[in-house]
Swiss-Prot record:
It holds the Pfam family Toxin_34. Not toxic to mice by intracerebroventricular injection. Keywords: Secreted. One of its GO terms (cellular component) is extracellular region. This is U14-ctenitoxin-Co1c. Signal peptide: none annotated. It is found in: Secreted. It comes from Ctenus ornatus. Belongs to the neurotoxin 04 (omega-agtx) family. 03 (type II/III omega-agtx) subfamily. Expressed by the venom gland. GO terms for molecular function: toxin activity. Its main location: secreted.
Length: 31
């Protein structure tokens, strides 16, 4: 998946979560 925009939350995609976490783009719940 692609990186999420600033302020957006992941929709359950682990790729988006990983990208989100690594790039500090948003407050993603890591599971």
């Amino acid at each position: 998946g692609s990186c999420l925009e600033l302020g957006e939350y992941c929709n359950g995609s682990k790729d988006d979560c990983q990208c989100c976490r690594d790039n500090a783009y948003c407050g993603c719940d890591i599971f």
